[in-house]
């Protein structure tokens, strides 16, 4: 495991005096043209940090360790296994190696955040609220799983930086939102309110009130809530996908319906692959595969119910780790359409779909594990009692099935855990602007860019 940019982009960018004007207009402070590194150049080795060989242990590189912990936490939540609690190696500068665990990473990140109230930086000199909000999600889920309290740094950071990172007029209306902040020169690089969508999506499970404020302001600026205004396709659909996901999460049915209809027409959703068993959004790019990040964001509005994204982090289903579970499915020859426990009926419901015509109707097996009492087991297949199963241990059974479409109802006697995850606190805020707004000074340097000229941000307007 390693971070290529951190290992190779040493010192200032040698090409920073050659950036094209279009790029300068978007990303470089006006008073430092030719003397300032573009976003994306990490500049490992510059002062005051010096060369830091460890991508995780470094003061910067937040976009590596923050996202890494988020992915690791999601992996643990999915599998129920503390995989990253064991030591893993991280590649460093000059072929050095560093041993880390997820738990040490979280302690390090939380400590860094506590010491730097403006937030740890990504590239040297640049703090990104977008990345910090994703890093906060990782801490939030980590705390829920391991019953820790590292996430407290996030709401404290939001309140501490709100009046510096965001621009409000005298009435409290949002005028601009942050892209990055450079603490060495006290410079905010900002865009209009619609840029807030990128932060709102990751902020909503952590600070739903301010996240919704960012979302509503962006929607109004873009005109998505105006049924008389046409929604137009832009070159970059990322923010429209984020808007759709946010609309669903916040229960904004007007915007959700409008953006969903737009996505159906312009995102090119279609099935593909053998027997059309795969699905993706192709965005009319005429490419071999769907774009990964774009398609994944677009799918956020297709899975789960309204509020599911926030509940994943604020009220995760930890009881599932002790619930009866389906294992041993011959994927991808058999697809799992449904597998869930109903604690009220003490029943595990399973729907399987055959996906390989060559193996159609031939025999195979599945396993059900973590059954509390084998003496109470009853199995139904397609609505009828089914006895082609046997115990394989004190809490597991093996069921004979075939490569065909099957519905199983398995009475297990499991009625739910007595205690679920306790991480269910709601951050309540009555005002969008901190009462201490006169304490945090405004930045000495501010540049508000016109994102309508950016090829990757044109869907955002100003």
Name each model-derived stretch.
Residues 389-391:
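Short beta-strand segments within Ig-like beta-sandwich modules, predominantly Fibronectin type-III
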Residues 1-2, 56-70, 126-134, 190-195, ...:
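Aromatic- and histidine-enriched alpha-helix N-cap/loop-to-helix transition segments
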Residues 41-42, 46-49, 74-84, 195-378, ...:
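Terminal, non-catalytic domain-edge segments
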Residues 12-19, 166-172, 227, 268-276:
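Boundary/linker segments of alpha-helical solenoid repeat arrays
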């Amino acid at each position: 495991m390693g971070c290529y940019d951190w290992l190779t982009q040493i010192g200032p960018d040698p090409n920073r005096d050659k950036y094209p004007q279009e790029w300068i207009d978007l990303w470089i402070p006006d008073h430092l043209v030719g003397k300032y590194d573009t976003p994306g150049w990490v500049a490992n080795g510059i002062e005051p940090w010096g060369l830091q060989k460890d991508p995780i242990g470094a003061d910067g590189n937040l976009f590596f360790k923050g996202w890494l912990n988020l992915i690791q936490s999601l992996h643990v939540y999915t599998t129920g296994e503390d995989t990253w609690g064991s030591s893993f190696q991280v590649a460093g500068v000059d072929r050095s190696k560093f041993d880390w665990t997820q738990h040490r990473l979280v302690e390090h990140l939380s400590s860094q955040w506590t010491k730097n109230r403006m937030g740890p930086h990504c590239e040297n000199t640049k703090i990104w609220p977008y990345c910090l909000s994703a890093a906060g999600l990782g801490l939030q889920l980590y705390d829920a799983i391991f019953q820790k309290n590292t996430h407290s740094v996030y709401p404290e950071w939001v309140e501490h930086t709100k009046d510096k990172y965001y621009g409000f007029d005298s009435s409290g209306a949002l005028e601009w939102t942050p892209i990055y902040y450079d603490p060495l020169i006290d410079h905010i690089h900002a865009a209009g309110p619609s840029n807030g969508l990128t932060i709102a999506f990751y902020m909503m499970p952590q600070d739903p009130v301010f996240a919704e404020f960012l979302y509503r302001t962006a929607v109004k600026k873009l005109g998505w809530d105006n049924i008389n205004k046409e929604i137009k396709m832009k070159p970059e659909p990322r923010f429209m996908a984020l808007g759709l996901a946010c609309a669903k999460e916040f229960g904004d049915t007007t915007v959700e319906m409008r953006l969903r209809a737009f996505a159906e027409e312009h995102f090119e959703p279609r099935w593909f692959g053998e027997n059309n068993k795969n699905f993706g959004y192709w965005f009319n790019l005429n490419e071999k595969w769907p774009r990964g990040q774009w398609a994944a964001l677009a799918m956020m509005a297709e899975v789960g119910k309204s509020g599911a994204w926030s509940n994943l982090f604020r009220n995760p289903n930890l009881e599932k780790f002790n619930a009866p579970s389906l294992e041993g499915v011959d994927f991808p020859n058999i697809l799992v359409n449904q597998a869930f426990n109903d604690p009220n009926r003490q029943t595990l419901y399973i729907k399987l779909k055959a996906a390989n015509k060559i193996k159609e109707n031939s025999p195979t097996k599945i396993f059900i594990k973590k059954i509390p009492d084998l003496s109470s087991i009853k199995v139904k297949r397609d609505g009828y009692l089914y006895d082609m199963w046997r115990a394989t241990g004190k809490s597991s059974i093996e069921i004979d099935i075939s490569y065909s479409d099957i519905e199983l109802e398995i009475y297990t006697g499991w009625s739910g855990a007595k205690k679920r995850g306790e991480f269910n606190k709601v951050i309540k805020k009555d005002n969008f602007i901190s009462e201490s707004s006169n304490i945090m000074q405004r930045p000495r340097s501010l540049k508000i860019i016109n994102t309508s000229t950016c090829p990757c941000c044109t869907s955002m307007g100003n």
